Amino acid sequence: MATYIRLTDYKDSDSKEQGFFKSENRYEAKQEDFEKIPGSPIAYWAKEAIKKSFENNLLGSIIPVKKGMDTGNNDLFLKLWTEVNFNIIGIGLVNGQDTITQCKKWIPYNKGGEFQKWYGNKEYIINWANDGEELKQSTANLRSQHLYFKNAITWNALTSNTTSARFSDYGALFDSAGSSMFPSNLYNFYLSFMNTKIVDSLLKIINPTLNYGAGTVGNLPIIFPKQESVKQQIDTLTQECIEISKEDWDSRETSWDFTASPLLIENGKLRIENGKIEDAYNAYCEYWKEKFY
């Protein structure tokens, strides 16, 4: 048995000194307890229930959880979707052959990005002309090619605080910084699981460096609800979160599905009558306040 003092939440030396003498910052743990967690991290602050949770199936043993590609030259192979002719971007393609038959050069590319739950961060595209001919002839590390273009759940592998996962259903390829999982069903369940506070806590135990790559996420323990009513409720609520997040994302001009300024939209329809900007703005604020809160 060893005693540990956790001071990571204190910002400066003076507050750390004060925290050093507080009993709530002291923990006792056995070395063998660390071995219950994949990678044996020195997670002395983990409660017994958390350590016991790792006796369940790990996520990576149930579904593919994969690290994406490294192009070797992002400046050459990647663009923001707004930088190229939209007509040669292939959105929703099924496989690489579609880039040839439909004359598409650029494909959506999941690359992590800012904190964004449920849906969004659809900013980057990758040169996959002729089924990735140029990239395949380069020094790029093209991992897990059999999973390209498939529906996925992707997340920010690198984060400064809290991870966020999103549903990807637009025929994307994926980056090492936008690692992804590929369930064959139950997409909403896995997505909701990834966006829970408990997963955020588990990730910080498995890998305190906040680098949540495929290996780290694949070691998450997971339990499936037994009651069908609970499964249905999770599915319904998650789908609602996806739709709200998608509507929010598409309300910006940075989305390729943008149609009109949200100030011109009321209850999902284009405003017909002329009105004051102030009234439109207030209606906009009320609409999204109701959606999110």
What are these regions (language model features)?
Residues 1-96, 121, 135-139, 150, ...:
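Signature of N6-adenine DNA methyltransferases within the class I
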Residues 41-44, 53-62, 221-293:
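Non-catalytic DNA-recognition/assembly elements of restriction-modification systems
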Residues 103-106:
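Structured secondary-structure scaffolds
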Residues 117-144:
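Sequence-specific dsDNA recognition surfaces
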Residues 131-134, 158-162, 186-187:
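Short, charged/polar surface micro-motifs in flexible loops or helix N-caps
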Residues 193:
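Conserved catalytic core of Hanks-type protein kinase domains
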